[in-house]
Amino acid sequence: MSGTAASPHDVPLSDRRAQDVPAHWLLARLGKKVLRPGGRQLTTRLVGMLPLRGADVVELAPGLGLTARLLLDAGPASYTGVEGDTDAAAIAAQSIGARGTIAVGDAKRTGLAGASCDVVLNEAMLTMNTNAHKGEILDEVSRILRPGGRYAVHELALVPDDIPLASAEDVRLSLVRSQKVNTRPLTTPEWQSLFAAHGFVVEQIVHAPMRLLHFRRLLADEGVRGTLRIAGNYLRDADVRRRVNTMRAAFQRNEKHIAAIAIVARKATASTPGSAGEAAIQETP
């Protein structure tokens, strides 16, 4: 996932106070490149699970463009990113250059032609939408996918599957307050039911620990130099430091109840209708 990195002043909302910025853009301001719940490892694994060579690929909310480069390296026929933030779209376009196309658009209404792609992928995006908006996004993905096309996501899950409703709401509110985004993770069965309700057959599920701000994960995702850069920026700004500490505390407090989840689902056809049945579920250490 190498390539041109955005400077702290290029990332969206770089003019806002640290306490007001959504968590992912605050971390990008620090110089963090990998912003997904399961880190570089789960993203790489998810991309490797997809039939990308010769495929028409769409990525929703490509952000800084790191996953876009992984997708492009797999040899698709075409790549289109649809990004809702104009600043992020500019960063992603710079990241991939002439290898693909970045459009500014809404994941619920992409403006893309129906049945025009084979694979759609998004990361850490459905989680940040209400349940109603999740459904609208899945309907849009179904519209633009060809029959039998794959939809892949890398999101946040609540664990265990039978977490009490009160505990789930406590986790959600804690994440909303610390992340400054409308974080609404689901349990694995709830994710499966959501996909089935909108015409998808879930084929594969992979879980991984949610350790976005753990030191070992930082090293694995960012490398030694990247981790040192992040640490330097963290130490130089007291407001950023306080906000990151709040985020880390929320993650640690809820660590037993949140995990990263990757899902690959197939657009159902008349002969293979959607189902919330068994999928291959794997755990990543």
Where are these regions (language model features)?
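Conserved class I S-adenosyl-L-methionine
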Residues: A55-G63
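Class I SAM-dependent methyltransferase SAM/SAH-binding core
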Residues: L64-R109
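A short glycine-rich, Lys/Arg-flanked "PGG" loop and its adjoining helix->strand segment in the class I
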Residues: G135-R150
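Conserved alpha-helix/loop element of class I SAM-dependent methyltransferases that forms part
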Residues: R36-R53
